[in-house]
From Swiss-Prot:
Record's protein name: DNA primase DnaG
Phylogenetic placement of the source organism: Archaea, Methanobacteriati, Methanobacteriota, Stenosarchaea group, Methanomicrobia
Co-factor(s): Mg(2+)
Organism (species): Methanosarcina mazei (strain ATCC BAA-159 / DSM 3647 / Goe1 / Go1 / JCM 11833 / OCM 88)
Gene Ontology cellular-component terms listed: cytoplasm; DNA-directed RNA polymerase complex; exosome (RNase complex); primosome complex
Enzyme class: transferase
Gene designation: dnaG
Disulfide-linked positions: none
Length: 522
């Protein structure tokens, strides 16, 4: 084949002849029968002289008085001219004395084959030659960074425990599992670290935790959990941070390390989770002292606000020195103190005696004072006992005579109750308490209709998937589990009005037409 360097296409054709013919007969027939057929520009002899087509290859075999074979015509013409040339071969109908038929079945693109070879060779060159001879810039940076980290790594105590250079000078330290974890944090500039080398906590580390604010940062696997359990028993730690599930601290990148340390939780929150009791020795006393500083004394805020508001109350005088009266103006903040504290705040000592007056002479001002009377509202969804109310009209007149305060307004008085009335049973408790008691500790759920009749009783683990496919008259769900935002959303989509569980989880929003209750509220 000639001019293989310039060949673009190869025309593949097959020939069938009724007789015995040889290669020279076929080549002569091709040149002879196509001469002048396509014009001077596409004459095969001229194209072969100029190198536009290559050497015509013929491979034939004769058997049983017939000849079969293949013809290959290389071409450096473009696609259009090559197609015309291939079609002209099919016009040959005789080779020598025999009738013959030529059929083109493929036009091979030689450049595509070359491209495949180039790709395969490039893969081989890339994998075999570059890995060992040309280091990447990242490898150079890692090598320099590794040398710096090794120089910064120091040791603590007689046991030469690996640690960062700032462990002794820093007020807060991070306890890690091993030396590789320290090197990884040094890579990102965190130098106040020390390792414990497994679940056997060194005494030097346990002693160091008494003097500093300590964060335990462990792997997100079973081993990390065991180290935390050991630290809770022998050391004095303040916070706990965990790597993502299934990951090690030594494999974390900078973003994951910062995110995990920001999500650290106080040790008090995980003591109950791991079932560890605090030690009753001096170490525990130190921890409890620090804990008390971190606790937010939210319960102290509400009484302080209520005390300030009590100075603004209206002073009401009583008829006799032994009778107390209901206060006629309540601060709004009394809602937060709870209904059981409200009766203590709504009575005032009498400072002077006022003679009795008939109830018939009650002025219009007294009626206005009664109209403005407010009552303490319960803090949790109207489930608690309501505070004592000051009634209007005739009922108020029956309780006691009207008296006049120094400001000139008349109010009605009544003796203080000897003790608080018993708490009434809420309708929800009557409806759902039997179901709650029956399901306690069973990890099952009951789906109720509008008449509070049980439609179906299933396991809690199947409740979410079952509610998604439920289309019956479901109005309430009572189950022995935690109420989550996912369950609230599913119940809202099915127009369920009541959702009762053991306790409420992290819920961001609850529909206005849905009651979310716990067994303690009932």
């Amino acid at each position: 084949m000639q001019n293989t360097d310039t060949t673009k296409y190869i025309i593949h054709s097959k020939i069938n002849a009724d007789g015995v013919i040889e290669r020279p007969d076929i080549v002569g027939a091709i040149f002879g029968q196509t001469e002048g057929l396509l014009g001077a520009d596409l004459d095969l002899r001229d194209l072969q002289k100029t190198g536009r087509i290559g050497r015509i290859e013929v491979m034939v075999t004769a058997k049983g008085g017939k000849t079969k074979g293949n013809i290959f015509v290389p071409s450096s013409l473009d696609k259009v001219e090559t197609s015309i040339l291939a079609a002209s071969l099919e016009t040959i109908d005789r080779v020598g004395p025999c009738s013959a038929k030529i059929e083109v079945f493929q036009v091979e693109d030689v450049r595509a084959v070359k491209r495949k070879k180039i790709i395969e060779r490039a893969k081989l060159i890339f994998t075999k030659m570059f890995d060992e001879t040309v280091p990447e810039s990242q490898e150079l940076a890692d090598e320099v960074r590794q040398s710096v980290r090794v120089d910064e790594l120091t040791y603590y105590g007689k046991s030469r425990i690996p640690c960062g250079p700032n462990v002794l000078n820093s007020d807060a330290i991070i306890i890690l599992e091993g030396r590789a974890d320290i090197l990884n944090l040094l890579r990102y500039g965190i130098k106040n670290t020390i390792c414990v080398g497994g679940t056997n906590i060194p005494p030097e580390v346990a002693e160091l935790t008494k003097k500093k604010t300590v964060t335990a940062f462990t792997d997100g696997d079973r081993g990390g959990e065991l180290i935390i359990r050991e630290l809770l028993q022998v050391a004095d730690i303040d916070y706990v941070a965990r790597a993502p599930d299934g990951k090690c601290v030594e494999d974390l990148v900078q973003k994951e390390i910062i995110r995990a340390l920001r999500r650290k939780v106080p040790v008090e929150q995980i003591i109950e989770k791991y079932g560890i009791q605090e030690r009753e020795n001096e170490d525990s006393a130190c921890r409890l002292e620090r804990v008390s500083k971190r606790k937010i004394r939210a319960p102290e805020i509400v009484p302080r606000i209520a005390e300030k508001k009590l100075h603004k109350r209206v002073k009401v005088h009583r008829v006799s020195p032994k009778a107390d009266i209901h206060e006629e103006e309540f601060p709004e903040e009394m809602e937060e103190t709870g209904p059981e504290r409200a009766p203590e705040k709504i009575f005032e000592k009498v400072t002077e005696r006022i003679p009795e007056r008939p109830a018939e002479k009650t002025s219009a001002a007294a009626e206005r004072v009664e109209a403005r009377t407010s009552v303490a509202k319960p803090a949790v969804m109207a489930r608690a006992v309501p505070a004592t109310r000051v009634t209007r009209g005739k009922a108020a007149a029956e309780k006691g005579p009207a008296v006049k305060v120094p400001g000139g307004e008349a109010v009605r008085v009544s003796p203080a109750p000897a003790r608080q009335a018993p708490a009434p049973v809420s309708p929800e408790a009557i409806r759902f308490r039997p179901h709650v008691d029956a399901l306690k500790g069973t990890l099952t759920a009951r789906i109720l209709d509008s008449d509070d009749k049980v439609i179906e009783e299933i396991a809690v683990r199947d409740l979410a998937s079952r509610l998604k496919n439920y289309r019956d008259n479901v109005k309430s769900v009572v189950f022995d589990g935690v109420i989550t935002q996912r369950l609230v959303d599913i119940a809202s989509s099915n127009e369920i009005k009541n959702l009762i569980g053991v306790k409420i989880g992290n819920i961001a929003k609850v529909p206005a037409d849905m009651e979310v209750l716990t067994s303690s509220m009932l």
